[in-house]
Amino acid sequence: MRQPPISLVHGMHINLSGKTALVTGSTQGIGLAIARGLASSGARVAINGRSEASVQRAMDTLTAAVDGADLIAVPADVTTDDGVATLQAQLPTVDILVNNLGIFEAVPALEIDDEQWRRFFEVNVLSAARLTRIYLPGMTERSWGRILNIASDSAVATPVEMIHYGMSKTALLAVSRGFAKAAAGSGVTVNSVIAGPTHTEGVEDFVYQLVDKDVPWEQAQRQFMVEHRPQSLLQRLIEPEEIANMVVYLSSPLASATTGGALRVDGGYVDAILP
């Protein structure tokens, strides 16, 4: 199998022109920031969400933010067989797959029921494995591809208030490593990005589950970090664009020797030299 030429660094310019990227759950938060970063780097980006309305809002946001953005609207629920079939029909070929879709919630450990355990596995793990199974063969045939799975610090430092979420993100690390081995020598890389506590609408809601809802946001954020994430070296929530920067780099030809890894963008939250 012929390997593509290795890219050399010239001012760290990332050019993804000619590449098609799919970012699941890309209508808000980290997914939207990743989609913006990829589009800004020249990729054709498929915007995915469960509803046409949410996808269209994201499309409008990105069109206004990125000059000449090349976007595809792909409303589909990728946790269902029908949704995946719809997505695959609209997007038969993908060069960059970012499995960003995920759910989380705070529930006391002994109150997590069987259905919640199943739901977190199906949404956070199985959807990523399913899409990888669909798109990885085409990438290996073309001798180029990038698969990124958005994990979490909860994968390696499980919070007691959401162990079902931590379980799903730990499983996602194993899925990433396993598929990286399956793609060995093909020119396709598979990596996880371990995101630390990140400032999104969903996280704001989560913070206010643990902090008095009457407390202003800036104070609530600081209180949350001190009381619930004191080991963070950054001592603030990470912005979605900071996660996106790592994903864009890993999606590029510059990251050709990085595969099978779990790369941390966690603000030093995980107290370890290695993941």
State where each predicted segment sits.
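Short C-terminal tail/terminal secondary-structure segment
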Residues: 2-15, 157, 247-248, 259-275
